Amino acid sequence: MILPTVFDPEEIDYFDIDRQHSHEFYVPVKGSKKRILSNLGPTNIHHVLYTRCLNYLDRKINAVDVGCRDGEFTRYLTWSFPNVYCFDYRKSLYFAGNVSLQAVTHYTVALGATQSQELGSGRNNFRNPVFDAPYQKRKLKENTQDTILPLDSFQLPEVNLIKIDVDGMEEEVLKGAVETLEKYQPVIVIEELIMADGLPNHDGIKFLSDLGYEEVFKIESQKTHRDYIFVKK
């Protein structure tokens, strides 16, 4: 059984309620554990997608953020949803400073098609062949692995929206959430990256279409980066 994440007090101390309805987020300083405040502005991709999603929701009860990272999308979800369930196999140093922990339930676990054990890379892409330093040490010296679970195993109630941004495992996440999708028909926000060979990094878009979902919004912020909103027909 996976218990919710417990954040360190020093991480929580960075939280400021006055920033919760702003676009200011703590972001990492490359190459260090330091953090700086950055104003992403209302046109940032997370806010644009969040705002668009509201057009397709008649109720706002429970949202799910898969690949929540530093809480850049999560915070916006807390503006509308009383309950937000967040998943990331890495515990971010910045999440608790960006998001009110009273509004979310965070799990430090990867989501996939079935329950399994696998060593993640420490990067956004769980299976990136290049490991971050702490994960490289685990790979070489420790007999520890990361847990992967299907979303359906959490039996979350009345899910209205699911956002998935996991750099390649999107289809696997969807396969592990079929019961939830069929029962609640949530709005889906999903990222797709175009690889060097011109192909997408996952087949989640086709999987959603096969489940009877249709694309209602698409934004291509870069030539290799697409985000979609899907709703059940």
Model-found features: residue ranges?
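Phosphate/nucleotide-binding beta-alpha loop and adjacent structural elements of enzyme active sites
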Residues: 1-233
